[in-house]
Each structure stands twice: as structure tokens, then as C-alpha cells.
Amino acid sequence: MMTTANAPQANRALKTKDTSQADTKLSALFAARHDEQNLQSPYDIGLIIVALALMTIGIIIVTSASMPVAERIHDNPFYFAIRHGIYIVGAIIAAMVVLELPMQFWRTANPYLLLAAIGLLVAVLLVGRTVNGSTRWLALGPITIQAAEPAKLFFFTYLAGYLVRRYEEVTENLKGFIKPLVVFFALAMLLLLQPDLGTVVVMFATTIGLLFLAGARLWQFFALVFAGVLAVVALIVFEEYRMKRVTSFLDPWADPFGAGYQLTQSLMAYGRGNWFGQGLGNSLQKLEFLPEAHTDFVMAILAEELGFVGVLAVLGLILWMVVRALQIGNKALLKSRPFEGYLAYSVGIWFSFQTAVNIGASAGILPTKGLTLPLVSYGGSSLIVMSVAVALLLRIDFELRVDGVQALGRGDNKRTSKAKAKPSAKSAAKPAVRTKHTNAEPFADAEADYNQAPDLKASDVNAPDMHESSEDAPVAKTKDAGSKKASNTVSPEDEGKAGIKAILARVSKEASSE
């Protein structure tokens, strides 16, 4: 026998064994849940590949588009390419850090992130750096930060948290619907003072989309859209440079060397691209004919060098990423994780709308706006923030996968414990021997015990243990009479009945004692 001193050690050994078995079982369940390609990583490999593919295309096109202007300004044709490569490394590091943060951090910290967004937008107005008439950058030594980029992400995390905390207010009364719009309008005013109408439009579209998905009433949704369109029109009409952009967008060839110059050069780049492009590095518009060729108009250079096929490939990758973000959001909502669902939805809407505005502006479909192409255009702030957004999608998907595996593990453990506890104490106490007696219909409650009882005869039954009736008295007398034969000799059929009753009486006694 085990001594008292050795008992704790034995218990610890058993716990260690159970833990190792649970870890092994969890790994097996995860392996069974995913195919062989995803077996090495619990993350969405497809999403990682698409994001890296867009970054790779981005550095190739940025290198090609920026060489002439980099040579003229910095005497180094690879100046912007090197910086963009550094930004990509920083973006990957930032994404890896965010990937280690649980979603609980974002759920609890989103109000503080909103305060950080407001602080950044106020700081850029006070000590920001002005470029081309816009004050949008904070200079931190050799690093410049475009404050609007992290402000977008921080606002979306706050909005997702608000929709979870105030879901009933948003869906049932106007007050809950208006509250997040007040926060949005405060941020919009700070952005318009820079000025940065493009970011305001993207944030507004994402806010509308999230409120609609959260269950806002339809009339509120349409009223908000109508009010937003009126506000944008008013902002355009009362600002002369914005009005010039709109008029040049409607007819850029009316002033091809003035207000419509940038758009006409971009359209010529698209026209020269044809189906398969002029070849990588063979663009003419990048020779400083097209301003901002490596930032806002990088898609025009890509279209000129890689043609319609190249544009279609980039659009396909971004579309896949957007659809995947919406799928992750829908999966999170179905698994009762609304914060993660709304945040994933916001990333999908954000990426899709910003892509549409960037390409629409460079193709003459929309007025020109200073918005980057996600993960492709030159710009450290945009690249890092959007990489962090992709990392959030990966983290949400990872936690959903882990939840699924743990649920499978819990279900398997329950089934195992039920299987172990299936034999009852009564059935374990009696030998599983087939009986010859089958006349047990009047005793349905004790049928299982009767079926596993051993064969007995009336001679094996003690009279005191039986609840005798007047009919059973001759049986007891026959037992006491020994070998003498009386006139009331018991038949074999009566012996069987007496044995059955004796067994059932014993079962009844055992049940009452328990």
C-alpha cells in the first residue's frame, strides 16, 4: 500500500500525466481540424501570403516609380526604395508584436486608444510639419508619423467596443445611435483642420457600415448617409481648391496643364498599359511627368508597366483580403464574440473603401484624394498601421480557431467520462450470468437486475427473506419436509416463480438500504 508521505508525489505525477495527455489530445484535435498545409501554424496562412504578396508588389512598383525623382532630389535612385524596405521590416515587426496581444487587450484599452487618437490629431495641429499646404505629419527625429493613420485604427477599435457595450441603445433609440457620431464629428473637425478630407470620408463610410451591421434602424442609416453626402458637398463647395479638383475631375482635358494636369498624366499612364503593359521599369509617366507617382498614383504606374493583367491581379489580392476580413467578422459574431466581429468588419470596409477611392481617383472616376493603396503605396505610417490591421485579423482568426479546438477537447473529455461512468454499481456488483427465468413482466423496474442474476431454485431461497402469501406457504413446508413427498408437492414451474420473487425481494431490500 502507498504511504501517506508518498501520496502527494503520486497525485502530482497523476496530474502531470493528465496534463501531458490533454496537451497531446489538443494537438491531435487541432491537427484533425486543419488540413496538412495549415498543420504547422494555427494562423491563416492564406491571409499572410496575400499580405506579403501585396508588400512585395508594392516595393517593386515603388522602386520603379521613384527612381527618377529620387535621383534628382537625393542623388540616389534607390533612396525611396531603401526607405520603403525599412518600412516593410518595421511593419512586419509591428504586426508580429500585435499578433502576440490577446484581443482582451483591445477590448479593455479601446477608450484609451481613442484618447490617444485625439491627442495625436491635436498635436499635429500644434507642432506638426506642413507639406504641400497640409499639416499632417509629426516629426520625431528622423521619423515622421502621419497622425491620421493610427487615428483611423484607434477610432475603429473604439467604435467596435461601443457597439458591444451599447448594443441595445444603438438598435432601440436615437440617443445610442448619435453618441458614436459625436465622437466621429469631433475627430472629423480635427482632420479637416489639417486639412484631410479623404481620411474623413473613409472613416465616415466605415462608421456607416458598422452601424448598419450592428442593427441600426434603416431610416437612421439613410438619414446618416444623406447628411454625410450633404456635408461633403458643402465642404467641397466652400473650399476653392476642392472645387477645382471636382471640376478638373469632371473634365480634366479642359485644363490639361493646370488643374487637370495630374489626372491627365495618370490617364495617359493607364492608356499606355494596354493588356500586358510596357514592361517592368519601362514607364514614361514616372519620369516626373506624373506627380506623386510612387505614393497616391502608384496604381497608374503599375497599370502602365504591367497592364490590365497586373491591375486585375492587385485588385484580386485586395478583394480576397477584404472578403476574408468579412468572413472572419461573420465567424466571430456567430461564435458570440461581437467586439472581434465588428473590428474585423471595420478593417474589411476600411480596406475596400480606401482601395476604391485610391484607384477611382487615379483612373478619373472620383476626385483626387490623398489616400494610399493598402500595403502597396509608399508611406511608412500607412504601411505599418495597415499591417497592424492585418495582424488583428490574424489574431481574431487565431483565437476563434483555438476556441473551436478547446470546445472539441471539452466535448471529447465529456464523452470519455460518460463512457467510463456508464456501468452502474448494481450491475458491477453482480456477475453477468444469463438466467433461465424470463417471467419478469410484472417487475419492470427490476428487469435489468433480474436479467443479470444467477440461476436459483426454490430450495436455495430462505423463507424468512421472502414476502410470503398464502399461496407460498406450501413451498416453505416442502423445503422443511426434506425428502418426504406430501400431497402438495411443488411443480418445477412453481419453483421458478418462487425463485423470481426471492430475487426481486433481495433487489428491493438492497435498493432501500442504499
Swiss-Prot record:
Q: How does it sit in the membrane?
A: Multi-pass membrane protein
List its EC numbers: 2.4.99.28
- Give yes or no: UniProt keyword Cell cycle: yes
Q: Where is this region: Disordered?
A: 411-437, 449-501
Which pathway is this protein assigned to? Cell wall biogenesis; peptidoglycan biosynthesis
The family database entries (InterPro entries) matched by this protein are listed as:
Cell_cycle_FtsW-rel_CS (IPR018365), FtsW (IPR013437), FtsW/RodA (IPR001182)
Give the catalytic activity: [GlcNAc-(1->4)-Mur2Ac(oyl-L-Ala-gamma-D-Glu-L-Lys-D-Ala-D-Ala)](n)-di-trans,octa-cis-undecaprenyl diphosphate + beta-D-GlcNAc-(1->4)-Mur2Ac(oyl-L-Ala-gamma-D-Glu-L-Lys-D-Ala-D-Ala)-di-trans,octa-cis-undecaprenyl diphosphate = [GlcNAc-(1->4)-Mur2Ac(oyl-L-Ala-gamma-D-Glu-L-Lys-D-Ala-D-Ala)](n+1)-di-trans,octa-cis-undecaprenyl diphosphate + di-trans,octa-cis-undecaprenyl diphosphate + H(+)
The reply on keyword Cell inner membrane is: yes
Q: Where are the transmembrane segments?
A: 45-65, 86-106, 108-128, 137-157, 182-202, 218-238, 301-321, 347-367, 373-393
Superkingdom of the source?
A: Bacteria
Query: Annotated Gene Ontology MF terms?
Result: lipid-linked peptidoglycan transporter activity; peptidoglycan glycosyltransferase activity
User: A Pfam family name for this chain?
Assistant: FTSW_RODA_SPOVE
Got a GO cellular component term for this one? plasma membrane
Q: Name one GO biological process term.
A: FtsZ-dependent cytokinesis
Which keywords appear in this protein's UniProt record, sorted alphabetically? Cell cycle, Cell division, Cell inner membrane, Cell membrane, Cell shape, Cell wall biogenesis/degradation, Glycosyltransferase, Membrane, Peptidoglycan synthesis, Transferase, Transmembrane, Transmembrane helix
| Protein's cellular compartments | Cell inner membrane
Enzyme class (EC, first level): transferase
Q: Which HAMAP family match?
A: PGT_FtsW_proteobact
State the family named in the UniProt similarity comment for this chain.
Belongs to the SEDS family. FtsW subfamily.
Q: What does this protein do?
A: Peptidoglycan polymerase that is essential for cell division.
What protein is this chain from? Probable peptidoglycan glycosyltransferase FtsW
Biological source species: Alteromonas naphthalenivorans
Q: What is the lineage of its organism?
A: Bacteria, Pseudomonadati, Pseudomonadota, Gammaproteobacteria, Alteromonadales
Q: Which gene encodes it?
A: ftsW
